[in-house]
Amino acid sequence: ATASTEEELVNVVDEKLGTAYGEKIDLNNTNIAAFIQYRGLYPTLAKLIVKNAPYESVEDVLNIPGLTERQKQILRENLEHFTVTEVETALVEGGDRYNNGLYK
């Protein structure tokens, strides 16, 4: 393959890891298990966040229908841990956002 062909071949997941996706919870692409690290988010709020994606901004999670005031407070306290990037099919197809089959 020529250099120009090699440059055109990009692994979209590796490319995504070079963004804030690798540093924060990407509300549009991250697996539900990532929310475990923040108190009060897993499993209930994490499921709601994943179910209601995609989001245009981090603050959009505060508009999920049916949230209690306590849930909104927990989300507000964690907004700094979230980011939003474009939905990447390789990360969200099938049921991988709920169960990616990785177990400790």
Curated annotation (Swiss-Prot):
Signal peptide: none annotated. SUPFAM superfamilies: PsbU/PolX domain-like. The keyword Membrane applies. GO terms for biological process: photosynthesis; photosystem II stabilization. PSII binds multiple chlorophylls, carotenoids and specific lipids. GO terms for cellular component: extrinsic component of membrane; photosystem II oxygen evolving complex; plasma membrane-derived thylakoid membrane. It is found in: Cellular thylakoid membrane. The keyword Nucleus does not apply. Its main location: membrane. Keywords: Electron transport, Membrane, Photosynthesis, Photosystem II, Thylakoid, Transport. It is a peripheral membrane protein. It comes from the Bacteria. One of the extrinsic, lumenal subunits of photosystem II (PSII). PSII is a light-driven water plastoquinone oxidoreductase, using light energy to abstract electrons from H(2)O, generating a proton gradient subsequently used for ATP formation. The extrinsic proteins stabilize the structure of photosystem II oxygen-evolving complex (OEC), the ion environment of oxygen evolution and protect the OEC against heat-induced inactivation. Requires cytochrome c-550 (PsbV) or OEC3 (PsbO) to bind to photosystem II (PSII). PSII is composed of 1 copy each of membrane proteins PsbA, PsbB, PsbC, PsbD, PsbE, PsbF, PsbH, PsbI, PsbJ, PsbK, PsbL, PsbM, PsbT, PsbX, PsbY, PsbZ, Psb30/Ycf12, peripheral proteins PsbO, CyanoQ (PsbQ), PsbU, PsbV and a large number of cofactors. It forms dimeric complexes. Belongs to the PsbU family. This is Photosystem II extrinsic protein U. It comes from Thermostichus vulcanus (Synechococcus vulcanus).
